[in-house]
Every structure is written in C-alpha cells, then in structure tokens.
C-alpha cells in the first residue's frame, strides 16, 4: 500500500491531534481479556478530550447493555452496539464505519442510523461508510464511491448517479428509435424493459418517437445501478468514466 491520508490538509499518520477528531467502528470490536464497556469507556476518555460522559449515559439507555459484562461474552450484534455507543460518545468530527450494521436486527439498525444522522445534523459530523450493503447506503449516504482492487472506479453524488441512468418499461409495435444508450434490454411478454443512460427528459422524448402504448420511466436503486454500470468480473471501467 502507498499514499497519504489527509484530513483538512493534515496527515493522519502519527498525528494525535488529528486522530482525536476521528472515531472508527470496525467490523469487529477488539477488546483485551475481560475488558468491559466501562473499561473501554475509561480508555476512550483518555484518548478523546471531547469524550462526552453525559452523552455516554444517554446512549446507555438506548443500547441497554451491561457495562460490567466482558465484551468477549457479547454476541456480534451486541459488540457492534457497544462500538457505536463508545464511538459516538467521543463526539468526533469524522466517523468511519466498516460494515456498520452487520449483525444488528432491523429495529436496532434503524435506531443506530437515527443516532448517527442526528449527530450529522446537530454537530456536522462527516461519516465515511465502507459497506457491501448498497441498499443500506442508499438510505443514509449522499455521496458514493465504488472501489475495485484498491482503485476508485466511480465517485459521484448519489443524486447525480441516479439522474444519469433510467429504467424504462414500454409496450410498442415499432422499432426503438436511434440515439438511445442501452445498457441492458429484456422482454417479458409484450413489455420491454430497458436500462438507459442519459437525461430522463431526453430519453422520454426519444421513446415517444416509437409511439408506445405504455411507457413508464422508473428510478433505479443504487444496487441496480451498480449491477448495470459495473457488472461483470472485471468491471468494465470504460462504461462508467466519461
């Protein structure tokens, strides 16, 4: 690996002042021996000058975990809750999440994201999420980057990404007009389904030329965009960089 990670122009490596502004929730929470949440709280309190004990107590009512129980005896979902509890109590400027809700039940997932979004709204916290769950990201992120083999293949606002690709379902007896950029095409009965790249208004105008009896333009989910734009073993970069 190579390169340098910077936050606000400052290198992160061996920079305690910058690291104190960052909290990370890993895929698996590391704890030594019989360490408890209370032990970890004391540890975090010394690492993070802005650690908020009042916030810690408030979140304790939400997560309702036993502070005196060894973390290694918690289930994965309970360990994940403990990680959120500790990290959010640090009042970080930057919150880094790795597969953040893996192991949590649907109710707790919603609760956790609600807490994170409240911090974003109230404190301006920037959240960086690494996840394979695109459906989850679509609900909480406003900017998306897709990496493959360590390279950033696509980085764009979610709105811009969704504006650039459209699903069309239509019924027509005439051939499709020229000038359409078709990423995928299928047919079930008389209904054709097209995945098209381009502006929705331009696509609608072109499809109108074949006088369809039915024509619906639908937004795609982030997962669908990923499949149609980056599908295939090697992810054809030429299809997404323009």
Q: Which ranges hold each PLM region?
A:
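Conserved ABC transporter NBD signature motif
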Residues: 2-18
């Amino acid at each position: 690996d190579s390169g340098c990670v910077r936050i606000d122009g400052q290198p992160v490596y061996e920079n305690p002042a910058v690291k104190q502004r960052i909290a990370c929730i890993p895929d698996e929470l590391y704890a030594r021996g019989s360490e408890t949440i209370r032990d970890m709280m004391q540890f975090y309190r010394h690492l993070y000058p802005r650690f908020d004990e009042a916030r810690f107590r408030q979140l304790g009512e939400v997560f309702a975990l036993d502070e005196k129980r060894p973390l290694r005896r918690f289930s994965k979902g309970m360990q994940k809750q403990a990680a959120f509890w500790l990290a959010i109590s640090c009042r970080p400027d930057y919150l880094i999440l790795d597969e953040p809700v893996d192991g949590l039940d649907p109710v707790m997932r919603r609760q956790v994201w609600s807490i994170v979004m409240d911090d974003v709204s109230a404190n301006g916290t920037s959240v960086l999420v690494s996840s394979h769950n695109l459906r989850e990201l679509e609900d909480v992120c406003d900017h998306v980057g897709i990496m493959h083999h360590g390279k950033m293949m696509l980085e764009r606002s979610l709105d811009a990404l969704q504006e650039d690709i459209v699903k069309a379902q239509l019924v027509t007896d005439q051939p499709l007009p020229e000038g359409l950029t078709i990423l995928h095409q299928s047919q079930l009965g008389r209904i054709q389904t097209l995945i098209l790249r381009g502006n929705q208004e331009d696509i609608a105008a072109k499809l109108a030329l074949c006088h369809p009896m039915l024509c619906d333009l639908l937004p795609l989910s982030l997962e669908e965009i990923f499949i149609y734009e980056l599908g295939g073993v090697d992810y054809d970069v030429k299809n997404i960089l323009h």
